[in-house]
Amino acid sequence: MDASDFVEDEAAIAQQKLSNEEYKIWKKNSPFLYDLVVTHALEWPSLTCQWLPDKESPAGQSYTQHRLLLGTHTSGQDQNYLQFAQVQLPTTGADGASNSAESRLDLKQYDEDKGEIGSYSATTARLSIVQKINHDGEINRARYCPQNCDLIATRSVTGKTYIFDRTKHSNTPSADGVCRPDIILEGQHKEGYGLSWSPLKQGHILAASEDTTVCHWDINNYTKPNNTLQPSATYTGHTAIVEDVAWHNHHESLFGSVGDDRQLLIWDIREPASAPKYRVEAHTGEVNALAFSPENENILVTGSSDKSVGVWDLRNLKVKLHSLESHTDEILSVCWSPHHATVLASASADRRVNLWDLSKIGQEQTPDDAEDGPPELIFVHGGHTSRPTDLAWSPHMEWALTSAAEDNIVMVWRPSKAVIDTGNEELTPDDLE
C-alpha cells in the first residue's frame, strides 16, 4: 500500500464515520420530521424504483396496498431479477391527515430481521417482494408503460432494452436463470440509464445510451415470429454519453435528452434524427437527468454534476429561468410531484433528497432561515447513508416518495405536513412562469 492508498482509506473511513453520525441525528429527529418512514434492506441494491399506478384498500383493514417496481445489481455474484414489491402502508397518517403523537412513526420499533423501521400504533408498514423475473445482467432502469402497467421496459448492461409482460411470467423465477423478455429492443451497443415511455402515444419508448445515441422504438411494430425489434429512429446529436431522456408530457412529437457533453437537446420526431430542434449548453458539468413538468407545457428541469438543478422555459432556452442550489455533490435524478404543480424532488450523491417549491423562489428570509438554504428548498431527506440511485413520487399519497440507494436500502417516506406546509394549493401552472 502506497501513501496515496493510505490517504484514500483514511478519507473513506472519515466519510463513513460522518455518514453514520449524520444518520444517528436523522433517526433521532425523524419522529418530528415525518408522517411515514419505511426502510427496507433488499438482498441486493436496486438502481431503479418506481411506484406502480394501482392501489388496493382491503376491507376492514387500516392499511392500503401499493406496488413498487425494483431491480437488482449483483455485480455478477448472483442472478439478477426484475422485481415487484408489495408495500402495506397505514391509512392513519398516510392517506389520512392524522399527525397525533400516538399515530406518529415510532423509530424504536425496528425489525432487525426485515431491516425495517416504521409503524403506526397497531399497524406496521411492510414491504415484501411478490414477483421476480430473471434478467440478463443488472437492471440500470425499469419503467412501466403508462397505458398498460403490466408492460415493463428495462435498460440492461448489455446495451439492449427489454420488454416484459408481467402477466406472462410466474411470480417465482425459473430455476435455469434464463432471461426471457417478450421483446428485445436492439440498436444500441452500450449500456445506459435513460428510459422513457410516451405518456401520449402507447407503445412508443426512448432509451439513452453510453454510445452517444437515443433510440426510439414503436413496439406496435413488433411481430411475433422474431422477438427483436429495430428502432424507428436513432438520434445522434450528442458528442458524449447520453445520461437521460424524457418525452414531453403535452406534445407527442417532442422529447428531450441530456448528456456528459453538458448539452440539453430538444427533439421533434417529425424532423431529421441528426438535427435537434434546440441545443443549449445547460450546465458547467455533465447533465445527468431531466424532467418535463407534468402541468406546465413550457417548463422543464435538468440535474447536473455541477451540483445544481436548472429550471428552463422552452420558449426561451437561451436563458436559464433559475438554478436550484443546495446540494453539495452531483445531481443524480429529478422528478416532479404529481400533486403540486410547482414542487419537485432531486437526489444527489451527497446522500440527500431535496424537495423544492418553485413558488417560493424570491421569498424573503430571516438570516437564520437563509443559513438552512434558499426559500424554495422546503425539505431535506437525510435518511440515506449511501448514494441514492433513483426516486419517485407516489401517485396516490400526497408528499410520499420512494428512494433506493447503493447500500441495498429502499425507503418509502412522507414528510410531516406540519414541516412542509407549503400553502401552495391555490397556485396555477402559470405561476411557474
From Swiss-Prot:
Keywords: Chromatin regulator, Cytoplasm, Nucleus, Repeat, WD repeat. WD repeats lie at residues 134-174, 187-227, 237-277, 282-322, 326-366, 383-433. Regulatory subunit of the histone acetylase B (HAT-B) complex. The complex acetylates 'Lys-12' of histone H4 which is required for telomeric silencing. Belongs to the WD repeat RBAP46/RBAP48/MSI1 family. GO terms for molecular function: histone binding. The gene is HAT2. Component of the HAT-B complex composed of at least HAT1 and HAT2. The HAT-B complex binds to histone H4 tail. It comes from the Eukaryota. One of its GO terms (cellular component) is Rpd3L complex. Residues 368-372 are annotated as: Interaction with the histone H4 N-terminus. This is Histone acetyltransferase type B subunit 2. It comes from Mycosarcoma maydis (Corn smut fungus). InterPro entries: G-protein_beta_WD-40_rep, Histone-bd_RBBP4-like_N, WD40/YVTN_repeat-like_dom_sf, WD40_repeat_CS, WD40_repeat_dom_sf, WD40_rpt, WD_repeat_RBAP46/RBAP48/MSI1. It is found in: Cytoplasm; Nucleus. GO terms for biological process: chromatin remodeling; regulation of DNA-templated transcription.
